[in-house]
């Protein structure tokens, strides 16, 4: 095509749109990095194994159920959750968390997960979400493999019983340090909230 002022203006207009898109993407990346850094900093200051009653804010979650509760079933559920979040442009600096029924925990059944979730700081613009209610939660940070959570759950239940704390219907496992943050599974940190 010929060089002309009109052609150059069209070219500049297209370039400006591309730059705006890149700036928007970079802004989202920067926000994600800041939030993820904040999660890591807070986790580094949190003592593992210390049980606390914590006032928690209302939190938004996008959730999915696993068809089967074996490793493959959970891998598929997490994949569905990621696809759903991608489809609805839901981004979060939080790692995937898992929810169990408190009744199962009280029966010492520590691997009967019902749901995996993506925790969010804000209500998503589209799609289905659930609200984790604000209120007092019995919390503890567990360091180590998720298959070793049973002992930490036992301690939580004993503490609740000794303090006569009424537990809610669900237990939330917020993954704070996962494979993105630590190299070894033994260094993983999961925050339990009952």
Where are these regions (language model features)?
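Short amphipathic recognition helices of helix-turn-helix/homeodomain-type DNA-binding modules
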Residues: 1-3
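A solvent-exposed interaction/effector surface
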Residues: 5-194
């Amino acid at each position: 095509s010929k060089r002309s002022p009109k052609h150059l203006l069209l070219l500049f207009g297209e370039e400006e749109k591309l730059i705006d898109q890149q700036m928007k993407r970079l802004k989202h990346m920067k926000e994600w990095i800041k939030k993820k850094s904040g999660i890591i900093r807070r986790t580094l200051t949190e003592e593992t194994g210390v049980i606390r009653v914590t006032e928690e804010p209302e939190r938004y979650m996008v959730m999915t159920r696993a068809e089967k509760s074996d490793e493959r079933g959970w891998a598929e559920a997490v994949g569905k959750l990621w696809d759903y979040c991608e489809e609805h442009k839901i981004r979060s600096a939080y790692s995937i968390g898992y929810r169990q029924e408190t009744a199962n925990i009280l029966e010492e059944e520590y691997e009967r997960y019902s749901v995996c979730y993506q925790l969010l700081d804000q209500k998503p613009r589209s799609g289905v979400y659930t609200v984790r209610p604000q209120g007092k939660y019995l919390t503890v940070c567990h360091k180590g493999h998720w298959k070793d959570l049973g002992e930490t759950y036992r301690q939580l239940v004993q503490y609740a019983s000794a303090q006569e704390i009424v537990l809610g219907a669900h237990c939330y496992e917020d993954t704070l340090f996962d494979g993105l943050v630590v190299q070894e599974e033994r260094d993983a940190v999961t925050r339990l909230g009952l």
